Amino acid sequence: MPRHKLIASESDVSIEVDEGKDKESCVYYVEVEENCERGKIKQASRDGKRRRERNGETRRKASEKRTNEGESKKAEKKHEKGHRTARKAGEKHGKRQRRKNAGEEDAEDKSSKEKKNMKNEKNKTLKLEEEKEKDVRKKKRKHVKNEEDETNHEKTKQHLKEEKRRKKRKKPETTSESESKSESESASESESKNSPAVGVLGSLTPEELENLKEAVEERKKLITQLKGKPWPMRRKLVVLRESQEFVEKYEGALGKGKGRKLYAYKVMMMKKWMKFQRDFENFKTACIPWEMKIKEIESHFGSSVASYFIFLRWMYGINMILFGLTFGLVMVPEALMGKPYGSLPRKTVPREEEASAMNFAVLWDFGGYAKYSVLFYGYYNSQRAIGWLKFRMPLSYFLVGVGTVAYSYMVVIRTMARNANEEGGGDDTSFNFSWKTFTSWDYLIGNPETADNKFASITTSFKEAIVEEQESRKDDNIHLTRFLRVLANFLVLCCLAGSGYLIYFVVRRSQKFALEGLENYGWWERNEVNMVMSLLGMFCPMLFDVISTLENYHPRIALQWQLGRIFALFLGNLYTFIIALMDAIQLKRAEEEIVKKNMTIWQANLYNGTVPDNSTAPPLTVHPADVPRGPCWETMVGQEFVRLIISDTMTTYITLLIGDFMRAVLVRFLNNCWCWDLEYGFPSYSEFDVSGNVLGLIFNQGMIWMGAFYAPCLPALNLLRLHVSMYLQCWAVMCCNVPQERVFKASGSNNFYMAMLLVILFLSTLPAIYTIVSIPPSFDCGPFSGKPRMFDVIQETLETDFPAWFSKVFSYASNPGLVLPFLLLLVLAIYYLQSTSKTYKRVNMELKKKLQAQNEENKKKNKLAALKAASDLEQARKAGEQRRNSISDLGVNEENPESHVSSSHTSRPPASRGHTSSGHLPGHPQQPQKNSKKR
């Protein structure tokens, strides 16, 4: 073929070159038309190869040129860089030479800096090496922790699975579930103690975290309900410790980040606050005076005897406040800032009394120097302001006297209201003995003496409950008891009338002795009134106690009747004494008028006289002891009350020592050598007289309230008396007395004591108010001397120390036209509140009756349900026995058919001849045979 035919045209061949690649590595694609022949294709391929080779050579040459040009450019750049570095080095060298020429100090600094830099580099390298070592150690620790967390995670998963299985097996309503959960959680807790809770919780699933939260909540509930569990104390302590550790371990760890820290802080503060509250309660209990003594007495003698000592402690607290007011605001300011002894006639012993002023008999009667001291009313000066503080002595004296009475009213009424609120809930008498049997013991007692006291207290409480139950079920002859009670009241009235007449007779005799002069009589005539009152107060309660045996009252009601009778006796004696004092006051005032007239004559004679001409007389100076003075009836009243308190105290203590201590010694040491049994016969050991001692306290306090205005020392004397009485009577009760034969619960007696104390407070303030308002004070003694009435000190203070408008407002407010409507409004408010309280009480009683009726119905339903369940169980048991007997009879009949046939002619079954079945006697037919025949 010709060559031009074999060469492909441009339309038949096209060459494509990849532009993204180098020319050397280009790939040529030849596309030939499909209609060309094979020869043409081969020729074209050969031509293409040749062309490719030519093009490759041209491209190689071009690339070599390019590489040569690039290398030349790089060499030029390197040469330029070398010139630049040489220039810079020259410049640096010049700078160094200049610095060297400037001075050698800069070189030294640079060398030191270079050294420091070297050291810093070395330290950095050392630190880097240490950090690398630490990183290696941390990695090792993390690896160990991860392994521990994985093991703990597996353990917690296993325990949670076990808890789920136990929850599925047991019902959620039973109480045993909480116990089993507590045991499983305690086991899981003991295993996971050594591992941190946070790491374990981080690897738990949400479901497992919820289960753990539920477990924590259940542990909390278990801690709150642990007291009500019927478990031994050892088990309670173990469960409590385990639950607290579990809650502390997982509760705070369930939070996240700041919340977890805040929760931990709250828990810590809550624990500290609870500990502080517990310690503060213990501190308050430790600060209560005589608490352990009273508890010991209550454990051996019951709550009735302990109520007296509690009442005595309460009275001690009131007298402590009264003593603080009188001592701090009356006695101390007068002793420190008032005029000293001997400066005024009222502060000086008269000349005729100086010889006997320090005798013991005189001081025992509070005369002599004791009379002219801060202990009594007459010593105080009537000056408005005393000392550098300008202390208003008359105003302070009056306000303290009124304030002590007001404080006493407030405290007594508040205590009565609190006792009424405590007693208003009612007593739950259902299952009384069961509660006492199973809940009385305190398992935290660790002292043998405390355990003995608790045992005695439980025994006494059982005796009290038995007496209450017996009295509620007692059914006596009504007509006989009414007759005996009327007779007892008639005898008591006769005793009261006789004691009143005796006191009136003695008072009239004492007035006759006073007119004739007490110096002419002995000790008994001078103290006849006080001694008769003390003896009546000692023997009349014993007579009332004997009479009360006829009435056959409940011990608590008998105590209240006894207290009421002794109250009437003491009240009559007290008011008879007050009437006698009023008569003595009138005599003193008449004597005072005579002294006033004599004072004018004495002063006239003192300053009138004859003097010779052209001479000067020396100034007249009269010693305060030589100045005539009035009788000062206020000091006389204060002395009488102080003597009465002292005589009553001494009578009480002597009676205690002779009537209790000597009697107990006689019975204890002469019982073995006497004709009869002294312990159970006459005289026997004495019982503690609750009623007499309580009334003694109440009337003693009434005399303090009545006489404290005229003798500021009375609260201090009463405080000392109560303090000594507490220790002496506690000792006498525990050593010399025996418990009462009929021990009763005195829960309602405390408010009865308060009611009598309130009556005595009211009756004792009436005479003091009468003397303050109606009787004018003495002219030469006391802080109110020179005033027409004692309460005028208020009006004087308003006029001198306050603005005019304030005194006008006070005068308008004290107008009877405003006071009487205000009092009427108060009476109406009291009546309204009393009526509403009665309705509330009635509603409460009805509600209580309904609740009791519902309780009785529930008891009946429970009994019927229990009987039904017991009958069902009995029927099921009988049915099971019948089935077992019938099955055994059928088996015997199948094994021995001949014996069964032969036994049909006998009167008893063959089973009774051999081994008898349970619950049947041999020789009697059994019911299972009938059941087998029916089958």
From Swiss-Prot:
Superkingdom of the source species: Eukaryota
Disordered: annotated segments: 1-21, 37-204, 874-935
Composition-biased stretches (Polar residues): 899-919, 926-935
Organism: Danio rerio
Protein name according to UniProt: Transmembrane channel-like protein 1
Membrane-traversing stretches: 303-340, 392-423, 480-510, 523-550, 555-589, 633-670, 690-710, 714-736, 751-774, 818-851
This protein's encoding gene: tmc1
Protein family according to the UniProt entry: Belongs to the TMC family.
Compartment annotation: Cell membrane
Species lineage: Eukaryota, Metazoa, Chordata, Craniata, Vertebrata
GO cellular component, one term: plasma membrane
GO biological process: cellular response to mechanical stimulus; detection of mechanical stimulus involved in sensory perception of sound; vestibular reflex
Catalysed reactions, as listed in the record: Ca(2+)(in) = Ca(2+)(out)
Keyword annotations: Cell membrane, Coiled coil, Ion channel, Ion transport, Membrane, Transmembrane, Transmembrane helix, Transport
PANTHER family: TRANSMEMBRANE CHANNEL-LIKE PROTEIN 1 (PTHR23302:SF18), TRANSMEMBRANE CHANNEL-RELATED (PTHR23302)
Membrane topology: Multi-pass membrane protein
Tissues showing expression: In adults, expression is restricted to the hair cells of inner ear and lateral line organ. Expressed at higher levels in the larval lateral-line neuromasts than in the larval inner ear. Expressed in the sensory hair cell patches of the ear at 4 days post fertilization (dpf).
